[in-house]
Amino acid sequence: MLEDISLTVNSDSGQPVPVRAWRLAGQGGGPRVHLQAGVHADEIAGMLVLHKLLPRLEQAHVDGRLRGTVTVVPQANPLGIAQFRNGHVLGRFHEATSRNFNRHFNESAALQRPATTFAAWQKALVDLAVDARIVLDLHTDSEALPYLYVNRCFWPDARDLAGALDASVAILWDNDDDGAFEGAMVSHWLREKQIEGRLAATVELRGQSDVSDALADRDAQSIYAFLCGRGVIAERGDPRAWSGEAVPMGHMETVFAPVSGVLVYERELGAQVAEGERIARIVARPGDPSSEHVLRAPQAGRLVTRCRDRLIAQGDVVVKLTGSKPSANWTGGVLDP
């Protein structure tokens, strides 16, 4: 049966708030799985995907086909959801500490008695997930193709996940000094020498506006098929061959806005661009033709993400694109602040 294992953490005002979570215990000794969405509380697509996936998992359990134990956390961040300001949810950063909700998980997990609501929430999520053999953390970018972040130690075994989700790109990383949730899983498993046969991945489900029944149904089916292929569900998964691109994180190019202004894209998502090709421009002072700043591809590659706002601040990420060689600008760590 579906077990409610919801957690309670304190909000920034000191009031208890729930982290809704459910667990289905399988009967066949299959892998333990943790699925969550909404660590960045303004990234909505994964919430709807898990909302649609949970009844399918429950039916598999009723039918006796669930072999593994699956934990589902469709909306993982009650702190971020509470940050509605002027009609928008400020879901990426914790207002009280200015910390990115998907950073510092390693630090928080190591604390015996977390002193802040932020750290206590992070530790609770890690404790809920760390015993799983498969951990999928669902996110979205601003505007994006579907893509994955995967530690290199899981590659190429994670090609089945990339194929199931029809991911355009798998970004392979080696070291996570910033403490993303996925990185906290990997760090713990490596420390305990439990990495064999496991998988943790950050799944980027396109852009923040890509929320619909059609997309959520497709993604829920993709994750279901992946779980079938991994032996979590006793059902044929119809694995898809993956035709995407695996790129080391250091080969990704991030183009930042050199000035503030009106952002105009000249190439679409998914476009293959040549080194030096125009990809966008920023009109710093509308009405002044001399204020246009042209942005060019630092190297040849494919446009994977772009900013959805068309009025951009200096220093914001404009686009990210794949590269075939190390980026001259990458110094380690994650691609976004």
For each feature predicted by the language model, list its residue ranges.
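Structured catalytic-domain cores with a bias toward divalent-metal coordination
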Residues: 1-337
